[in-house]
Amino acid sequence: MEDEIAALVVDNGSGMCKAGFAGDDAPRAVFPSIVGRPRHQGVMVGMGQKDSYVGDEAQSKRGILTLKYPIEHGIVTNWDDMEKIWHHTFYNELRVAPEEHPVLLTEAPLNPKANREKMTQIMFETFNTPAMYVAIQAVLSLYASGRTTGIVMDSGDGVTHTVPIYEGYALPHAILRLDLAGRDLTDYLMKILTERGYSFTTTAEREIVRDIKEKLCYVALDFEQEMGTAASSSSLEKSYELPDGQVITIGNERFRCPEALFQPSFLGMESCGIHETTYNSIMKCDVDIRKDLYANTVLSGGTTMYPGIADRMQKEITALAPSTMKIKIIAPPERKYSVWIGGSILASLSTFQQMWISKQEYDESGPSIVHRKCF
């Protein structure tokens, strides 16, 4: 690769797609990973109606569209829509020709093999990229925090996972995955707001609730105590103005919603909370590296952006770990984008340049080359 041709870094999340150029310190484009199609044919007479809309445009026209997320729980489930999202990323958001740039994509840990093969195939065959690479999201987050050893608790919109990493390599036997993330919390908030008498049901209204969640929710350090405070005073109540001007008030829902991360039983799920999952992940690792993992627990992803989450993690993991263990939870302020930032760092390294899968290698070996070259 000549120096002047920047690689493209695309972090395809279940909720948001983050894209930009390697070497930049933040993504240039961040937009919802959604494809919208008109609910009724021909409603928008004379608007030059398109058969599909992507990202922010789909979001702004959501009233007349059915919105679909092609990535569920971190895994691509609809490849036609995924292709639309990539097309939109390259041509509309970044305004680049993909055949001129190497492309670094990200994927969830423990992704099915067929998934990354398909990604590889689409990049080379549909977009004709000269080179590409698929990196594991959590590993990139760790790089972004300036470490090569640690455990990453990465929680986005569609999936949460704990990934222990030693000297730059993820330890697959100890990776744990939890299908509980931001989208589930949004749905849960919709449900508990309904109990308060507010009604949110459509895909468009779900986006409003997501906004309420992002602006008003927080994690309680002590849930029972916080419930007591909420019951005895109105000090925790906040109001929110809906798009139509109606104002709603929200109280204990503010911390009941993200509490589900620590108590999945709130959602009717029989899994361990994020604190216990992190601990279990550490316990699956060699006894000699556990100390390094406890001292380098890195939070990453948009669902770790709740105020109070780091303190609560510290408290919960301290309760589970041996009493003398030093525990440090690292919550970088830019953790919403740390996967992308790590990708930007990785793709700019001179040592990384021989790691790319080239078009030539792809033509010789086919999509399975991705398992040999990307880890």
Curated annotation (Swiss-Prot):
Assembly: Polymerization of globular actin (G-actin) leads to a structural filament (F-actin) in the form of a two-stranded helix. Each actin can bind to 4 others.
Q: What is its EC number?
A: 3.6.4.-
| Residue positions, PTM Tele-methylhistidine | H73
Q: Which top-rank group of organisms is this from?
A: Eukaryota
- Reactions it catalyzes: ATP + H2O = ADP + phosphate + H(+)
CC terms in the record's Gene Ontology section: actin cytoskeleton; cytoskeleton; dense body; focal adhesion; nucleus; plasma membrane
Q: What is its main location?
A: cytoplasm
Protein name listed in UniProt: Actin, cytoplasmic 1
Top enzyme class of this protein? hydrolase
Q: Which locations, inside or outside the cell, does it occupy?
A: Cytoplasm, Cytoskeleton; Nucleus
The organs and tissues expressing this protein are described as: Widely distributed. Not expressed in skeletal muscle.
Additional remark text = There are three different beta-cytoplasmic actins in Fugu rubripes.
Q: Which GO terms describe its molecular function?
A: ATP binding; hydrolase activity
Q: Which residues carry this modification: Methionine (R)-sulfoxide?
A: M44, M47
* Post-translational modification as stated in the protein's UniProt record: Oxidation of Met-44 and Met-47 by MICALs (mical1, mical2 or mical3) to form methionine sulfoxide promotes actin filament depolymerization. Mical1 and mical2 produce the (R)-S-oxide form. The (R)-S-oxide form is reverted by msrb1 and msrb2, which promote actin repolymerization.
Q: Which organism is it from?
A: Takifugu rubripes
Q: To which protein family does this belong?
A: Belongs to the actin family.
